[in-house]
A protein has these predicted regions:
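Active-site flanking residues adjacent to catalytic metal/cofactor-binding acidic residues
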Residues: 77, 107, 207-208, 235-237, ...
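Cap/insert and terminal regions of metallo-dependent hydrolase folds
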Residues: 214-307
Length: 319
């Protein structure tokens, strides 16, 4: 099973400012030695070895993850603005010829999880087939409403690909061919669902938009079947611990330390910090990752091989 991140921000898309780009250039030039910039080849090598936060960015698109199963199924989780770039890549293959098929699971319909759908090119191509899955019984109505003429010039019905909607039950498995999928309601204003994908003996769990606090971690056993035996856990860490527990409590998001507590409790093999606040710079995200790793090192219950990463656009995992 292969997992690729196309959108990693929460709330709304964001771009780098001119000042941020200038600071990255200044940082790179300050680090560089004469030999690093003596030729185009040496420059490219130098840039390739710079930290991501200097040579690039974690990304500003909202949530979208591509999952490719071992049997070739394509599962798209959430359709924030990141799905636009995914769609452009898909158009270079079968989807550009009207021969593509994919499954889309939507965790909920807050805008940062659906705002890329009107611009998802494969949906415009006749012959392509899309199956939409969600525990939300009125998902189709919600998606169609996003594209009424007062909001968008092209209606959802005008997108010529085949579109079928399936309502799945929370806390129960459903199947896409040989893939087992389990959804679970998450604590979030307006409602949200996490998704657990089992492909053979590999398990991927995605929990975007969920608010757990210290007390919830002590009383989380309702989530045992959802979080157990996870190879890769993607978790909402939009806020710092102070924001999650004080400044923005009840806004619907968690912190890295809470994510780590849950990942360690359920012995997840790898944790990915996700759904970044749009106001956070790359430097801020670096600090969050550094603090998270320090927290892991101080956690006596964390296994030696437990790893934590921070999501960025283009990040891939092979399970």
């Amino acid at each position: 099973m292969r997992i690729k991140f196309w959108g990693v921000r929460g709330s709304f898309p964001t771009t780098l400012s001119t000042e941020s780009i200038e600071e990255k250039i200044i940082t790179a030039l300050t680090i560089a030695k004469p030999g690093d910039i003596s030729s185009e080849e040496s420059v490219r090598t130098f840039v390739a070895n710079l930290p991501l936060s200097v040579r690039g960015t974690y990304g500003g698109n909202t949530t979208c993850i591509e999952v490719r199963t071992d049997s070739g199924e394509l599962i798209i989780i959430d359709c924030g603005s990141g799905v636009i770039n995914l769609g452009n890549e898909l158009m270079a293959g079968d989807f550009g010829q009207g021969k593509g098929s994919a499954n889309i699971f939507l965790t909920h319909t807050h805008w940062d999880h659906i705002n890329g759908l009107p611009f998802f090119s494969p949906l415009f191509i006749k012959g392509n087939k899309f199956n939409f899955y969600s525990p939300l019984p009125d998902l189709q109505e919600r998606i169609e409403y996003q594209q009424v003429k007062t909001h968008f010039p092209v209606g959802f019905d005008d997108m010529e690909a085949s579109k079928r909607f399936f309502t799945v039950k929370s806390d129960e498995y459903f199947h896409i061919n040989d893939i087992k999928i389990y959804s679970k309601s998450m604590p979030h204003p307006g409602g949200s669902y996490g998704i657990r994908i089992e492909d053979g003996d590999k398990v991927f769990v995605y929990t975007s938009d969920c608010e757990f606090n210290i007390n919830a971690v002590d009383d989380i056993r309702d989530y045992d079947d959802f979080f157990k035996n996870t190879d890769l856990l993607v978790f909402d860490t939009q806020y710092t611990i102070q924001e999650a527990l004080i400044d923005k409590m009840s806004w619907g998001h968690s912190s890295a330390s809470i994510a780590i507590d849950i990942a360690v409790l359920y012995e997840a093999k790898k944790l990915v910090l996700f759904h970044h606040d749009p106001g956070y710079s790359d430097d801020k995200l670096n600090t969050i990752l550094s603090n998270a790793r320090s927290y892991i090192n101080a956690n006596r219950k964390a296994k030696d091989d437990f790893l934590s990463e921070i999501a960025y656009e283009g990040l891939e995992f092979e399970l």
